[in-house]
């Protein structure tokens, strides 16, 4: 039945009707589908489709299939019912397949399958390039049997035929390349020749000339084999002489040109084979054994000495096996007998058997050369000479096969394997290597940083690409490695453990503090312009460039968050992978506010986490490993919400309102941890994190409505606390939960006292909503009676260090709550002050005074020095593996007990105690006298003495910034209490001067985020007369007495240092106003810090502190106003000076004089050279400023302090100075200013002369005598007023020839005269005299010529006085009018020098004495 094709008007109904008709007719279909066997391909030949009609083009030089760009996923298919697994398979093969040992994974490392790739050698050609093909070219190829072939197919076929012809011609060479006319002495022995004959070669399987072409395809191969066997039999029956004779006859019958052609091709093939043999590695046997070599011809190769081994014919495969295996060890018998029916057992393949040989012996490293690091599968660094057994899976066939372990390069190579287990294993090993490197296990055993090497090699993006894998095990390994890289061990534990400290929730962002070069170039731009430009540039920068400066930014640029969301939402990994992902998200959220916002705004990420890992209902979970975390509450998910909320108040508000976190908090807090149907440890951590999240929200004044709902729950929890605190032993997790509860109550109490901020006009403050807190004082007033018994109970354990350390932050949290409670109580204006005053007195009598009298408290004060990071800078040393692009606190092995965060640290408790004391004294000043004993504790005094001792500034690392931030809290609280006590005491305490020194040092060390503390120090301690007891105890008189002993008495009493100090003490209020105007932090930062420290929760915008790039104030902050004046004058040199220029300069000089006289340790960090540069700025500010009498007196006093004998050796102008790019440039501008406006001012001239000392750089003296010679006319400072000894300028002798020539020229020309510039005149005469009479035999010819010329010119001078001075100079003496002594008669050596001059010079004047 023949059906017509469908027509345009027919529909699907018609097609179905046609199909029904066709099926009813039962006709045979036009096409029959045949499904061949998928295993063996044993379909009948008659059913195979013909291939003649297809136009197939085969490329010999390219594989049939393109290489796989990505590793193919592992096939997940179960056996179909039609093909069950065979039950009669080999047990050994089944065991190998199910072997789960590590060696089973590493036994076959396959990166890409190349077994199917056909490798063909290029066709030899006599021309450099193949001929160009033209369509008009005639073809000799037989056309295809069926149909027309394409031009491309015909060309490929022609090339293949020509290649076959050349190959067949080459195969003729072994048979015809005979030693024609061989010399008898060069003929090899019979044994060697017999091995070289074709019949004796076991590897000769087929003939070279007889191909069977022309016969039928079925009998061609059989006939060829028959002919071959007959030829071999005849050759074996012949003698070698007969064979050679037959060869000679055959060569005589052939055309000589054909023989020459075949021999030339044989020589080319032999040379090619020799080159290939040389290129092979000597360690691996050659496997390219295809044909035997003929007897060599004496005409083609000349014999050479020692050429026997090289010319030895290549043995067959069996001979090679005998040669290689027999000399070593006897061949072992196989456990089974091989059968002839087995495939591929007739030919031994050496390259495949090479790996079965024994490993070469381990080479011992005899030298100190560096070796490649190798690691075990557990990430351990293996010693170069370690000898491990092979069953551990640490040996492979790469470089240095005898050494165990894997290098980083080999592990990177293994991550690209097609086998998923190998990729997962490589990632796991790399993860463990990173973990051990961060823990510092490698130490000095490796050269360089492992982490830096991995990141430079692209390890970060290798992990990112591995996350896109389809295999779950590879994804899990990649996530674990990413967590190991980003999340430093111990960092999160440290931050969690210190959350309940004094402002413990406020942390620095874990982001790099180094700015990019682009950011450094934009320092001069406005802030708004920088923000506008920075965002698009960062978006266009590639991820590797971002990761080079900031790893987190580079990762976020690779769309990491959507991939993690996909893994959580779609793949549903196991519990360990989920915890790793949550840990990575927490680390991303700690990076910055921007990163936290990206985590929050990632589509469906937070929704998935809240819904899947913080459900409100779940099935009970028992103790033990949880098979799945989905629909099960997870503490890490709650912690992620808490860290996100800490980044900003807006994020906290969005979490509470947009993700239904309020209901989650109610669900997890309403029940006790043991009633949550979760494992006990997980329940404790979950409840703790819920309390912390609520406390963070309460830090912004949010979450007050939850307090009303959960008020009964909180009261019940407080009532059970005494029972928990009395249990032994105390559980650390339970103590963390109790401390988190107290922290929550502290923030809720502060929220009850917060006053709504007034509407602000600034744009930075307008975003803060002025919404009053929903928590009132009435709701929190009943909490203190429940917390105070807990404090009393914990204080009883103070004499027991083991129990006290087990309490953790609980006592500190209790004290902080009480401080917040009394602070809020004192702010309630509608309540009677007498109530809270009496309650404070009761607390003092019942709790604080007994605590202060306990000896264990003194032990806490004594341990401050041991635990202080400021006194022990090495405790904050950065990890050698720390990277600037990946910030971490570096708490790998945990904190030692005697450290700022250790279990025995006194800082959290003492800081909380001082906070409570300050709150009580602020409200009740009558308690100050009873609590002042704290300030006189011996341990505190020793600690402060160590803090102000001269020492280099602590290096600012992420951990040191965190630790110092908490240490500075304690110091500030002590100083704040000392200020309150000093204002109430009639006489200053003995430790007042020490407290003042600590305040001055602390002011230069405070970090960003502590702007409010710096402002309070400037207002309170620093410029208070009470903290300068020297002003009332004979300090000015002692200063005058000291100056009289060292410098002599000054004529004018007003110029004495004592009078200047007295005036400075009177002007302290003006000095404070000056520094408040120039050293106060920015207003926005100050308001943010004030809101945080004063408990103004409605103004707090974030708990993330600014990045600690550097301290708030520079180390030379006392000179800061003066530097501002200098910069302002430099920016507007022609403008009029400011009205307050004289006042600012005078206040700065007064304060610096006070510090130089009574607090010299504060200026220890400012080098003397930097102080000199600041004094020079006084003269550069204005042309008339230095003429003011107060300025001159203060500068003279400071210059005298700078020129003291004990300070002068430390005056080094050649080293880099802080805040100064180049001192020579500053000195050059100073000389210009002196020449223009000085009018011979002596004090100005003293500052000019001070850098010209002999020990300083010659550049400064060259600048004066070369470019500013006019200065010499006005530099009339007398010798008696020189602040330093004259010998500092004249000794040692000058060795700069250009400067000596300038000296001589200035003297000869009259530019430098004794009455104009007596000091430099003396210096020039001394150095020229020393030069012209120098007898150094090592001098160069140029120096000798210049010396002789200068001496001759000196002798011929017409100025008798100058010649007398240059020739008869003896020693410098500032007491003489000339400034030096003269010889009455020239010494003999000088006379001899003069006698060496030319005779005409001597005749003119003779030798005068």
UniProtKB/Swiss-Prot annotation:
Domain of life: Eukaryota
Subcellular location: Nucleus
GO biological process, alphabetically ordered: transcription by RNA polymerase II
Major site of localization recorded for this protein: nucleus
One Gene Ontology cellular component: RNA polymerase complex
Single GO term (MF): DNA binding
Region (Disordered) location: 34-95, 189-210, 265-322, 511-547
Pfam families, per database record: RPAP1_C (PF08620), RPAP1_N (PF08621)
Modified residue annotations for Phosphothreonine: 337
Stretches with biased composition (Basic and acidic residues): 39-57, 85-95, 290-322, 528-547
Xref: InterPro entries: ARM-type_fold, RNA_pol_II_AP1_C, RNA_pol_II_AP1_N, RPAP1/Rba50
Leader sequence residues: none
Record field: compositional bias (Acidic residues): 516-527
Record field: compositional bias (Polar residues): 265-275
Keywords: DNA-binding, DNA-directed RNA polymerase, Nucleotidyltransferase, Nucleus, Phosphoprotein, Transcription, Transferase
Function: Forms an interface between the RNA polymerase II enzyme and chaperone/scaffolding protein, suggesting that it is required to connect RNA polymerase II to regulators of protein complex formation. Required for interaction of the RNA polymerase II complex with acetylated histone H3.
Family of this protein: Belongs to the RPAP1 family.
Subunit structure: Part of an RNA polymerase II complex that contains POLR2A, POLR2B, POLR2C, POLR2D, POLR2E, POLR2F, POLR2G, POLR2H, POLR2I, POLR2J, POLR2K, POLR2L, RPAP1, FCP1 plus the general transcription factors TFIIB and TFIIF.
Protein name: RNA polymerase II-associated protein 1
Species of provenance: Mus musculus
């Amino acid at each position: 039945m023949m059906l017509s094709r469908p027509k345009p008007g027919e529909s699907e109904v018609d097609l179905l009707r046609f199909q029904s008709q066709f099926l009813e007719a039962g006709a045979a279909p036009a096409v029959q589908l045949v499904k061949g066997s998928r295993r063996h391909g044993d379909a009948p030949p008659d059913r195979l489709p013909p291939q003649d009609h297809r136009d197939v083009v085969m490329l010999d030089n390219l594989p049939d299939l393109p290489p796989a760009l990505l590793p193919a996923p592992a096939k997940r298919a179960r056996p179909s019912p039609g093909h069950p697994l065979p039950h009669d398979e080999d047990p050994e093969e089944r065991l190998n397949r199910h072997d789960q040992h590590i060696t089973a994974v590493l036994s076959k490392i396959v990166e890409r399958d190349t077994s199917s790739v056909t490798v063909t050698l290029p066709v030899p050609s006599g021309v450099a390039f193949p001929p160009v093909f033209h369509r008009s070219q005639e073809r000799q190829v037989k056309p295809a049997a069926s149909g027309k072939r394409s031009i491309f197919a015909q060309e490929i076929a022609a090339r293949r035929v020509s290649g076959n012809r050349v190959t067949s011609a080459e195969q003729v060479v072994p048979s015809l390349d005979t030693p024609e006319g061989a010399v008898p002495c060069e003929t090899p022995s019979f044994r060697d020749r017999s091995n070289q004959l074709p019949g004796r070669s076991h590897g000769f399987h087929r003939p070279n000339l007889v191909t069977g072409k022309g016969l039928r395809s079925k009998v061609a191969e059989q006939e060829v084999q028959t002919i071959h066997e007959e030829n071999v039999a005849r050759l074996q029956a012949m003698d070698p002489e007969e064979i050679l004779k037959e060869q000679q006859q055959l060569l005589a019958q052939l055309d000589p040109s054909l023989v020459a052609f075949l021999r030339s091709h044989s020589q080319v093939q032999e040379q090619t084979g020799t080159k290939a043999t040389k290129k092979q590695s000597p360690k691996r046997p050659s496997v390219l054994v295809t044909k035997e070599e003929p007897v060599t011809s004496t005409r083609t190769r000349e014999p050479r000495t020692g050429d026997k081994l090289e010319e030895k014919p290549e043995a067959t495969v069996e001979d090679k096996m005998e040669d290689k295996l027999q000399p070593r060890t006897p061949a072992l018998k196989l456990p089974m007998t091989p059968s002839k029916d087995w495939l591929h057992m007739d030919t031994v393949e050496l390259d495949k058997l090479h790996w079965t040989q024994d490993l070469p012996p381990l080479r011992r490293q005899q030298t100190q050369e560096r070796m490649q690091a190798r690691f075990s599968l557990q990430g351990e660094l293996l010693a170069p000479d370690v000898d491990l057994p092979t069953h551990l899976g640490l040996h492979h066939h790469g470089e240095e096969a005898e050494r165990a372990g894997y290098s980083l390069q080999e592990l990177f190579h293994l991550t690209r394997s097609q086998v998923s287990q190998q990729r997962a294993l490589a990632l796991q090993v790399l993860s463990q290597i990173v973990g051990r490197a961060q823990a510092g296990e490698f130490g000095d055993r490796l050269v360089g940083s492992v982490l830096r090497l991995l990141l430079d090699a692209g390890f970060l993006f290798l992990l990112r690409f591995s996350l896109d894998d389809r295999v779950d095990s590879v994804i899990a390994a990649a996530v674990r490695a990413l967590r190991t890289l980003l999340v430093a061990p111990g960092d999160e534990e440290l931050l969690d453990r210190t959350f309940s400290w004094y402002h413990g929730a406020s942390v620095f962002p874990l982001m790099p503090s180094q700015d990019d070069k682009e950011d450094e170039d934009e320092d001069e731009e406005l802030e708004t312009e920088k923000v506008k430009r920075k965002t698009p540039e960062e978006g266009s920068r590639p991820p590797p460039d971002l990761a080079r400066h900031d790893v987190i930014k580079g990762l976020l640029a690779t769309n990491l968050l959507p991939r993690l969301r996909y893994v959580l939402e779609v793949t549903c990994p196991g519990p360990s992978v989920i915890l790793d992902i949550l840990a990575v998200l927490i680390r991303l959220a700690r990076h910055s506010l921007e990163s936290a916002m990206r985590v929050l705004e990632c589509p469906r990420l937070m929704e998935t986490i809240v819904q899947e890992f913080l459900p409100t209902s779940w099935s009970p979970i028992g103790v033990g490993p949880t098979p799945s975390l989905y629909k099960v509450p997870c503490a890490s998910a709650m912690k992620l919400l808490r860290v996100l909320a800490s980044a900003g108040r807006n994020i906290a508000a969005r979490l509470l309102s947009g993700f239904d976190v309020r209901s989650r908090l109610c669900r997890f807090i309403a029940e006790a941890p043991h009633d949550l149907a979760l494992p006990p440890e997980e329940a404790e951590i979950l409840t703790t994190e819920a309390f912390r999240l609520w406390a963070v929200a309460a830090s912004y004044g949010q979450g007050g409505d939850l307090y009303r709902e959960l008020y009964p729950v909180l009261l019940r929890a407080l009532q059970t606390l005494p029972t928990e605190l009395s249990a032994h032993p105390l559980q650390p997790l339970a103590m963390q939960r109790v401390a988190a509860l107290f922290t929550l109550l502290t923030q809720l109490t502060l929220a009850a006292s917060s006053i709504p901020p007034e509407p602000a006009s600034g744009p930075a403050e307008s975003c803060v909503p002025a919404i009053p807190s929903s928590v009132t004082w009435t709701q929190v007033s009943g909490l203190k009676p429940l917390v105070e018994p807990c404090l009393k109970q914990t204080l009883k354990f103070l004499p027991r260090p083991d129990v006290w350390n087990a309490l953790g932050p609980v006592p500190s949290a209790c004290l902080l709550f009480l401080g917040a409670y009394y602070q809020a109580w004192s702010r309630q204006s509608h309540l009677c002050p007498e109530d809270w005053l009496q309650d404070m007195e009761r607390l003092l009598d019942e709790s604080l005074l007994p605590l202060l009298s306990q000896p264990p408290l003194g032990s806490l004060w004594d341990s401050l020095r041991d635990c202080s990071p400021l006194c022990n800078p090495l405790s904050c040393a950065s990890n050698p593996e720390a990277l600037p692009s990946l910030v971490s606190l570096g708490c790998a092995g945990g904190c030692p007990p005697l450290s700022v965060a250790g279990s025995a640290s006194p800082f959290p408790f003492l800081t909380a105690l001082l906070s409570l004391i300050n709150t009580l004294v602020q409200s009740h000043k009558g308690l100050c006298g009873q609590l002042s004993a704290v300030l006189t504790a011996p341990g505190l005094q020793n600690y402060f003495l160590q803090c102000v001792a001269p020492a280099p500034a602590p290096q600012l690392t992420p951990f040191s910034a965190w630790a110092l931030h908490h240490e500075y809290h304690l110091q500030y609280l002590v100083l704040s209490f000392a200020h309150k006590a000093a204002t109430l005491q009639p006489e200053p305490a003995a430790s007042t001067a020490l407290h003042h020194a600590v305040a001055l040092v602390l002011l230069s060390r405070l970090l960003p985020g502590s702007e409010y503390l710096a402002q309070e120090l400037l207002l309170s301690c620093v410029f208070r007369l009470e903290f300068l007891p020297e002003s009332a105890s004979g300090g000015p008189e002692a200063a005058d007495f000291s100056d009289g002993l060292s410098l002599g008495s000054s004529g004018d009493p007003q110029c004495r240092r004592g009078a200047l100090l007295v005036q400075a003490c009177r002007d302290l209020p003006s000095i404070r106003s000056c520094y408040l105007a120039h050293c106060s932090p920015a207003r926005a930062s100050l308001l943010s810090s004030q809101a945080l420290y004063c408990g103004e929760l409605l103004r707090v915008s974030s708990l993330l502190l600014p990045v600690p790039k550097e301290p708030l104030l520079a180390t030379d902050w006392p000179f800061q106003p003066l530097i501002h004046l200098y910069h302002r004058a430099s920016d507007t040199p022609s403008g009029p000076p400011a009205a307050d220029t004289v006042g600012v300069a005078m206040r700065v000089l007064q304060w610096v004089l006070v510090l130089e006289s009574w607090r010299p340790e504060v200026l220890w960090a400012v080098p003397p050279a930097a102080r000199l540069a600041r004094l020079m700025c006084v003269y550069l500010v204005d042309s008339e400023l230095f003429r003011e009498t107060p300025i001159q007196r203060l500068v003279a006093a400071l210059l005298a302090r700078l020129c003291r004998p004990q300070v002068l050796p430390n005056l080094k102008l050649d080293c880099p100075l802080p805040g100064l790019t180049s001192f020579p440039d500053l000195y050059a501008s100073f000389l210009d200013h002196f020449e223009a406006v000085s009018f011979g001012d002596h004090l100005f001239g003293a500052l000019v002369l001070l850098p010209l000392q002999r020990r300083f750089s010659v550049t400064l003296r060259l600048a004066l005598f070369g470019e500013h010679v006019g200065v010499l006319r006005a530099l009339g400072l007398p010798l008696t007023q020189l602040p330093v000894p004259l010998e500092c300028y004249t000794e040692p002798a000058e060795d700069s020839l250009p400067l000596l020539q300038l000296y001589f020229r200035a003297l000869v020309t009259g530019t430098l005269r004794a009455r104009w510039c007596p000091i430099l005149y003396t210096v020039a005469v001394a150095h020229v005299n020393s030069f012209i009479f120098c007898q150094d035999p090592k001098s160069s010819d140029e120096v000798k010529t210049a010396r002789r010329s200068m001496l001759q010119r000196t002798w011929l001078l017409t100025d008798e006085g100058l010649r007398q001075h240059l020739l008869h100079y003896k020693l410098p003496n500032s007491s003489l009018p000339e400034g030096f002594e003269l010889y009455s008669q020239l010494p003999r050596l000088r006379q001899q020098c003069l006698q060496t001059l030319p005779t005409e010079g001597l005749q003119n004047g003779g030798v005068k004495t």
